[in-house]
Design a protein with these regions (language model features):
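Segments that shape or occlude catalytic/ligand-binding pockets
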Residues: 68
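Conserved metal-phosphate-binding beta-hairpin within the catalytic cores
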Residues: 162
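Extracytoplasmic cell-surface/polysaccharide-interacting catalytic and binding patches
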Residues: 1-65, 75-157, 165-184
Length: 184
């Protein structure tokens, strides 16, 4: 199975992978060569989501997609509270190319206010969080509508995380098995 590379200009998205630089909850880059990949089925859903967002004058910003199993181990080993990090022995939807972390950008390229950043690994990051303002909750619901209308499932603990239904039907992939050369 080959993954599909998601990169402008072929894809009308902004790609800024959080684990490609030090501005993330780990405080260091995880990917030596950050590139964005998805399973072909997830790429099809993403294409629909891009269209739904564009119809509303918005764009998607991708902050993570395929995450090689080596990277999943790095996150797991760094995180004392494992509530928000999938056990790499079972595999994450990201490690199957089946998940994408996204937010919305307005026509000026600024992120819509979601009431917390991507990777807000606290209850504030949950879809049902009560701390965001009504406007911030409306932005989260707008993203939820765009992504689910495109065919993605959502994850209750992360407003930014969308994945294929039944992602465990797909294999966990290492960087080498996927042929992505992200880890170095």
């Amino acid at each position: 199975m080959l993954l599909v590379e998601i990169a402008p200009p072929a894809w009308d998205v902004v790609v800024d992978l959080a684990y490609g630089h030090a501005d993330n909850f780990m405080g260091r880059a995880v990917y030596a060569h950050p590139r964005c990949f998805l399973h072909p089925e997830a790429a099809d859903c993403l294409a629909r989501a891009i269209g739904h967002a564009a119809a509303q004058g918005l764009r998607l910003k991708i902050t993570d997609a395929f995450r090689p199993s080596e990277a999943q181990w790095a996150l797991w080993n760094h995180t004392p509270d494992r509530t928000y990090v999938a056990d790499p022995r079972r595999g994450s939807p990201h490690s199957r190319g089946a998940a994408v972390d996204v937010t919305l950008l307005n026509a000026q390229g600024r992120e819509l206010d979601m009431g917390g950043p991507v990777d807000d690994l606290t209850p504030n990051g949950h879809h049902d969080a009560t701390t965001p303002t009504p406007a911030q909750r409306a932005n989260r619901l707008l993203l939820l509508g765009i992504m689910t209308a495109a065919g993605f499932d959502w994850y209750v603990k992360e407003w930014w995380h969308y994945q294929l239904f039944a992602p465990r039907r797909l294999p966990v992939l290492s960087d080498r098995a996927a042929g992505t050369a992200m880890m170095g």
